[in-house]
Curated annotation (Swiss-Prot):
Family per similarity comment: Belongs to the frog skin active peptide (FSAP) family. Phylloseptin subfamily.
Compartmental location: Secreted
Keywords (A to Z) from UniProt: Amidation, Amphibian defense peptide, Antimicrobial, Secreted
List of residues that carry Phenylalanine amide: F19
GO terms (BP aspect): defense response
Domain of life: Eukaryota
UniProt GO cellular component terms: extracellular region
Protein's organism: Phasmahyla jandaia
Function summary: Has antimicrobial activity.
UniProt keyword annotation of Chaperone present: no
Secreted is among the record's keywords: yes
Entry protein name: Phylloseptin-J2
Amino acid sequence: FLSLIPHAINAISAIADHF
C-alpha cells in the first residue's frame, strides 16, 4: 500500500499541474 502513495502523489501533482 505504501508503494502506491508516491504514485498517487505524482498523479495528483500531474492533475494540479494540468489545472
